[in-house]
Amino acid sequence: GDTPAEERFRTDVARAACFAALPTDWTRHVTVLAGDLSAPDLGLSAADRATLTAVTHIVHSAASVSFDLPAAEAARANIHTSLHLLAMARGCPALERFVYVSTAYVTPHRGARVPITETLVPLPAPAAELLARIDAGAPDAELLALTGHPNTYTLTKCLAEHLLVERRGTVPLSIVRPSIISAARALPFPGWIDSTAGFGAFVMLLGLGHLRAVVGDPEAQLDLVPVDEVTQRIAHA
């Protein structure tokens, strides 16, 4: 949007209920930089890039979570941004950890009760080749049929994992794969959530009475994970 990054932080982030228990001056420890992850050098000024070389930890959680973006747009949002950030990370000599927040759904559906391992998901072709096909305008239906992914979101998150691992060099990379993130179990307080994305909207519609019944499978498992457990895992990745 047109609202400056610093202003959005002050009005939308700093006032969030999840930070209410922190000291009143906690924001003095936060430096907001205006940039663009989709641009080379993250769209940052030379001075801001120099500032970032001192960071010790990078958490990359930015992404487009839209399931129906054209593959080329999803790749710009989820793959190229990740590679731009990795390039910046290589210039951070004090870096201790680069955490990439992925998704449990990088593994396409393979039938009931097939174990999902903490390894890269096999691809039908090298990740760089698949990305080149996306950038060249290959039809979405062709890409999804080839890889088994149900949508361009999971496909591009999967390719981002592969390319980060392949190109990380000496960057200390960790990947965290949460499933559907939902309300907090304990922190900042039980039930806290500030987003209607994902399961939050579903619960809100049920609670308000707008959604009275849904077709479901009583044997199916709903893959939800509390947001505070996800943040703890990211912090210790």
Label each residue range with its predicted role.
Residues G1, G35, I58-A63:
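Short loop/turn segments at strand-loop or loop-helix junctions that form parts
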Residues A14-H57:
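Conserved Rossmann-fold cofactor-binding substructure of NAD(P)-dependent oxidoreductases
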Residues T53, H57-A62, D68-R76, H80-L155, ...:
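Conserved Rossmann-fold NAD(P)-dependent oxidoreductase catalytic core, especially the SDR/UDP-sugar
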Residues D2-R8:
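Short, charged/polar "capping" segments at the starts of alpha-helices
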Residues T24-V30, M88-L95, A160-P172:
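A structural motif corresponding to the C-terminal end of an alpha-helix
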